[in-house]
Amino acid sequence: MSLQKFIIDIKNFIAQNTDLVIDENPVGFPDTPFYYLFFPEKNVVLHCISLENTVDDATFFQKISQLFAQKDIRVIHLWEDIWQSKRSIVESRLMSIFGKSETIPARLTQVQRIDKPTLDKFLVNNHLQSKVNAKLKYGLFLPNRYFRVIQNEKILQENAHKDAFLVAVASFSNAKKFIRDEQEYRSYELIRFANYQGFTVVGGLNKLLKMFIDEHAPDDIMTYADADWSDGTNYEKIGFERIELTPPLTFELDNETFTRKLADENTKNKVFNSGNWKFLMKLKDDAARD
């Protein structure tokens, strides 16, 4: 099959920024009308989804993910519209996955409350999903005295006049009350978390969560991981429990503008994602549960 331009662009970007070997459409991989780029050194495969092809099975991508999970291979379903519309963010995510992003230790950063415009601007520039309303908003700032750990000269120049550089954000919902097992729970949702493009704040989410928990004493925190990109293993590493894989979402996709919106009964050009992994961090005192 001839390669679409966006797949060639992905290959070129990775070749220019890493020394990883790329195995294309390996024998024995699950059947697909799309294209695989496999990186055996990282045990990662990019499932490159061209808009020229379609699938009618809403669970197709979930099934592909399950088959790769059985092989202990991480699969990323990389859609052409996402690559075209949010390329720099995708490139940053890929570099992080391949261990090529700059790292900043969370211990050098400070947690501060941020306002809605600051959060929204950061998410538009650094998160693949759209910004959403959030009641509680936090940022991780790297103080000027630690700018020496930044290697990117352009970032250094752009922020040299600042007292601190915003390197990550997290947003949370307000509390909702639920009754489970005859106990009342104050539950919050971690809505968004993002690092600044090109950087990974090591321990950043943990530090933001700690501040949030100290300030609000939640009984539990719920969050979701986009199954197109992740199985959410990193959430489990910091204390979240895997609850379920949600059904795929159905979108209406505009092939010209590379934009999506949730589908309705009149949608003709339907596409499906892989759903989301739901996680829960249980914080209520065990004694209170008994």
What are the residue ranges of the model-derived segments?
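Short, high-confidence coil segments that cap the C-terminus of an alpha-helix
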Residues: 72-73, 218-221
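A conserved beta-strand-loop-helix scaffold within acyl/acetyltransferase catalytic domains
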Residues: 89, 93, 98-206, 210-216, ...
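Short beta-strand-loop-alpha-helix junction that forms the active-site gateway
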Residues: 32-61, 175-176
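Short hydrophobic/aromatic beta-strand or adjacent loop that forms the aromatic wall/cage
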Residues: 34, 135-137, 274-279
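Acidic-basic catalytic patches of nuclease active cores, encompassing PD-(D/E)XK
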Residues: 1-25
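Active-site/acyl-donor-binding loops of N-acyltransferases
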Residues: 224-287
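Active-site beta-strand termini and strand-to-loop segments that position acidic
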Residues: 36-41, 141-143, 281-283
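Catalytic cores of nucleic-acid endonucleases
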Residues: 57-86
